[in-house]
Amino acid sequence: MADTEEAYGMPDTPVEAEPKELQCEPKQDNQLGASSKTPTSPPAAFTQQGMEGIKVFLHERELWLKFHEVGTEMIITKAGRRMFPSYKVKVTGLNPKTKYILLMDIVPADDHRYKFADNKWSVTGKAEPAMPGRLYVHPDSPATGAHWMRQLVSFQKLKLTNNHLDPFGHIILNSMHKYQPRLHIVKADENNGFGSKNTAFCTHVFSETDFIAVTSYQNHKITQLKIENNPFAKGFRGSDDMELHRMSRMQSKEYPVVPRSTVRQKVSSNHSPFSQETRNITGSSTLNSQYQCENGVSSTSQDLLPSSSAYTSLPHESGTIYHCTKRKVSEEPAEHSYKKPYMDTSPSEEDPFYRSGYPQPSSSSSSTTSFRTESAQRQACMYASSAPATEPVPSIEDISCNSWSSVPSYSSCTVGGGMQPMERLPYQHFSAHFTSSSLMPRLSNHAGTQPSDSHSMFQHQSSHQAIVRQCNPQSGLQQSSALQPTEFLYPHSVPRTISPHQYHSVHGVGMVPDWNENS
């Protein structure tokens, strides 16, 4: 591009222009009818034959003069930064039918390096070698003279960079050096281009547009002027000068920007959907990721959000982690010889006891498929045992439906001032309405019975259906309609304010006690 400048005789700097090249046309000013308020066009730095009548006026010259009096500074970054004030000009005197190319370049104003100290700029040394000059061609080029004279010609998209390997065509500058922008008007050739030796052109320089390139603003007065006049800096207005200066220096540095959606995804991924606390995730659609359980049941995060009728989980006090290992059973509910009705509380009640943290299956699927869990097997073993209490208690891992006789019954549960250490089989909280009187009449029917089926289970059905437990295949089948309301383990009328630390002694084994609302 430097060869291009030499081809049509562009001077390196405006100070090197010879006096004979500085031409001014007074009669053209009279023809334009410029008023006293409009500044006259400065003489062209370089003009060839046929380009004498072209006049250029700097837009917002008063604003440029304000910056020039203080010492204009322009931010340069690796990615490129636009100039403020923007370089805009009004061009007149062009041939309306001739095509022109308008372009800019920025050249060093001198061969010094500057520093800002004691609230002023001073020379600190010799300038660094200048980078090869780049030309910024206006996007509308080439265009007819009528097009250029119709409106302001703006170079606001021009960007300044300090990246010497910049591939985007930005103007490359060195920090702490003074530069002078220049405007070139070139008459397009027959190929709508320029660069040949016969190309006519003229160069216009406005001395009030020179500036020092910086990576952050040095003079707080420049910071204040930029904030007051730049419409994109209105967020900084209203603060004190030093704070504005500090913030502007911070804004000039390049920091990585993390998208909000990524942060929201990271925050939401740290919370399990099976937790006790209710969390409402209001992220974007990218948060609908799949959560896989051990049993192969998959659902989206929206399906796992707890609702008003959802169950809440209860943390295990013993510290043992129970995993959901639901297994399908091939038998139908009607094929079992003996079933004990067992009903859960209504999902509309917010009773925190014996609630599952996993989503309940739909009624259509639960009517044909039954599931059982390890916790249900442990409860069945706990209630069906009739062995004497003198036998040793096995560990939690050894308890299964094949060890009925080895598990002693819960003959009594006493809760004192503090919780006893859980050395044996951990128990779970029950309701405060346990009574021993209602248990004894029914205990005689099952005192001497031992279950022979090792596959007893809970029929895990929907929340509004009765959940039955298989106990003894020799006993008759009891229908849930023939049972009294006092025979359900969790009636719908259980109060919500039940203290988990109130118990009554249970003196029998093998059966779930009854209670009612008045007990």
Swiss-Prot record:
Domain of life assignment: Eukaryota
Keyword field: Cytoplasm, Developmental protein, DNA-binding, Nucleus, Transcription, Transcription regulation
Bias (Polar residues): 29-39, 262-282
Gene Ontology MF terms in the entry: DNA binding; DNA-binding transcription factor activity; DNA-binding transcription factor activity, RNA polymerase II-specific; RNA polymerase II cis-regulatory region sequence-specific DNA binding; sequence-specific DNA binding
Subcellular location per the Swiss-Prot or TrEMBL entry: Nucleus; Cytoplasm
InterPro entries documented for this protein: p53-like_TF_DNA-bd_sf, T-box_DNA-bd, T-box_sf, TF_T-box, TF_T-box_CS
Annotated region (Disordered), positions in chain: 1-46, 254-282, 293-312, 326-372
Protein name: T-box transcription factor TBX5
Organism: Xenopus laevis (African clawed frog)
